[in-house]
C-alpha cells in the first residue's frame, strides 16, 4: 500500500488527532504497543471478548507501529455498542439522550479537537441529529471518513459517503481489487 513511500515523505500522522467511532479497542493488543490511544467514551461498555475485534483491528490499521497508516497520530476511541458489547448502567436510558448514539459521539469528537472522524459503519439512519452532527463537523473543517459497508452491494442509500463532505471508503484486497465483501456506490471517494 506504499506506506514506506508515505513515511519517507514524513507522513506519519504526527500532530493529527483521529476520532474513531467503533467498537471497543483492546489497547493491550501487541500491535497497539506504543500507540497513543485515548478512550473518550462517554459511558462504560461491558464487552464480550469478541466485541473488541472490529474496534481493535480498525485502531491497528490506523496507528499500529508496524503497519498503521498513521502510527504517530493520536487516536481518540469512542466506543459504541457494536458487536456483542452492551452499554453500561451509566447510560441514560430510553426516552432520554443516548450518549452512545452516533450524533452525540460525533459532537464529542468535534469538541475534543478531532481533525478526522472515522465511522466504520453504513446505515440507513438519516436522522436530523446525525445530519446536523456531520454538518457541524464539516463546517468546522473536520474530515469525516465512512465505510461503504460490507454487504457486497451497491449501497448508495445506506452509507454516508454520498452525504456532502463525507469521504466514502470501500475496501480493496492486497492486489488492489475491490474486496469481495465490500459495498460500492456513487458516494465512494476512495478505496483502502
PLM regions: where:
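Substrate-binding/access-modulating region of protease and related hydrolase catalytic domains
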Residues: 84-163
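Active-site-adjacent substrate-recognition loops and nearby beta-strands
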Residues: 3, 146-166, 170-187
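Structural recognition of the beta-strand scaffold that forms the well-ordered cores
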Residues: 17-21, 74-79, 110, 115-120, ...
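Topogenic and prosegment regions of secretory-pathway hydrolases and membrane enzymes
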Residues: 1-23, 27, 104-116, 139-144, ...
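Subtilisin-like serine protease catalytic core
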Residues: 5-38, 45-97, 126, 162-164, ...
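Residues at helix-coil transition
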Residues: 63-64, 98, 111, 192
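Residues that line or immediately flank small-molecule/substrate-binding pockets and catalytic motifs
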Residues: 39, 82, 121, 170-173
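Sequence contexts marking disulfide-bonded cysteines in secreted/extracellular proteins
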Residues: 42-44, 108
Amino acid at each position: 500500500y506504499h506506506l514506506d513511500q508515505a513515511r519517507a515523505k514524513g507522513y506519519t500522522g504526527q500532530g493529527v488527532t483521529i476520532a474513531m467511532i467503533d467498537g471497543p479497542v483492546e489497547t493491550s493488543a501487541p500491535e497497539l504497543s506504543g500507540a497513543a490511544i485515548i478512550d473518550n467514551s462517554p459511558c462504560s461498555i461491558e464487552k464480550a471478548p469478541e466485541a473488541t475485534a472490529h474496534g481493535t483491528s480498525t485502531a491497528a490499521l490506523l496507528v499500529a507501529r508496524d503497519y498503521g497508516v498513521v502510527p504517530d497520530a493520536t487516536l481518540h476511541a469512542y466506543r459504541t455498542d457494536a458487536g456483542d458489547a452492551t452499554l453500561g448502567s451509566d447510560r441514560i436510558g430510553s426516552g432520554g439522550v443516548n450518549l452512545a448514539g452516533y450524533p452525540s459521539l460525533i459532537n464529542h469528537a468535534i469538541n475534543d479537537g478531532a481533525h478526522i472522524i472515522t465511522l466504520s459503519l453504513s446505515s440507513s439512519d438519516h436522522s436530523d441529529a446525525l445530519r446536523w452532527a456531520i454538518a457541524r463537523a464539516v463546517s468546522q473543517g473536520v474530515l469525516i471518513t465512512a465505510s461503504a459497508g460490507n454487504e457486497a452491494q451497491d449501497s448508495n442509500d445506506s452509507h454516508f459517503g454520498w452525504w456532502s463532505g463525507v469521504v466514502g471508503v470501500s475496501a480493496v484486497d492486497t492486489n488492489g481489487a475491490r474486496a469481495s465483501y465490500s459495498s460500492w456506490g456513487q458516494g465512494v471517494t476512495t478505496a483502502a
